[in-house]
């Protein structure tokens, strides 16, 4: 489906998810992430680039585990995360849209919790190349976690937090030889 078609259908409220491909599990337990790292930061930065072509095969579970941990996993016993957020609000939730369903990443248990048994990739945005990517990460702000942040600042703080998470994803992807 082209980007223009998606925009038109979205404006009319007619953009719909596709049926799930396969059976979604209620919980996907992720293996421990590989936190050793393989490349120096400057090499990772030199490799970072975006593409519109993705392999159609699923990401191996150990790679997905490390990707999600890098994005917004817990890296301290006190619940601290790999990406910063203002006053530690941790207001961003990371969802993973697969062909068989959509999941919420739970950093505390390092697991994915099923939230929808449909293929939501085509309705997570308007870029047509995401429709068939092996997965799509979606960052959603939960304003109820931002009560200590002035209302006028919440949108910009949440955008900064989501940007930090996205940057972690880009850096991990470049270090692991993945495309974004």
Model-derived segments and spans:
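N-terminal amphipathic, basic helical "cap/leader" segment at the start of enzyme domains
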Residues: 1-133
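Small-aliphatic-rich amphipathic alpha-helix that forms the alpha element of a beta-alpha
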Residues: 48, 67, 94, 135-180
């Amino acid at each position: 489906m082209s980007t223009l078609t998606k925009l038109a259908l979205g404006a009319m409220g007619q953009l719909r998810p596709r049926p799930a491909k396969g059976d979604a599990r209620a919980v996907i337990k992720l293996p421990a992430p590989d936190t050793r790292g393989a490349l120096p930061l400057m090499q990772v930065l030199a490799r970072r680039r975006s593409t519109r072509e993705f392999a159609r095969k699923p990401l191996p579970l150990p790679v997905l585990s490390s990707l999600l941990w890098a994005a917004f996993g817990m890296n301290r016993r006190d619940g601290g995360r790999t990406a910063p957020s203002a006053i530690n609000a941790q207001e961003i939730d990371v969802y993973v849209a697969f062909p068989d369903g959509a999941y919420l990443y739970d950093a505390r248990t390092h697991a994915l919790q099923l939230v929808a048994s449909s293929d939501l990739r085509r309705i997570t945005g308007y870029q047509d190349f995401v429709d068939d990517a092996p997965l799509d990460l979606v960052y959603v702000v939960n304003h109820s976690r931002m009560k200590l942040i002035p209302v006028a600042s919440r949108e910009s703080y949440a955008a900064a937090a989501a940007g930090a998470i996205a940057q972690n994803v880009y850096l991990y992807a470049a270090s692991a030889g993945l495309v974004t």
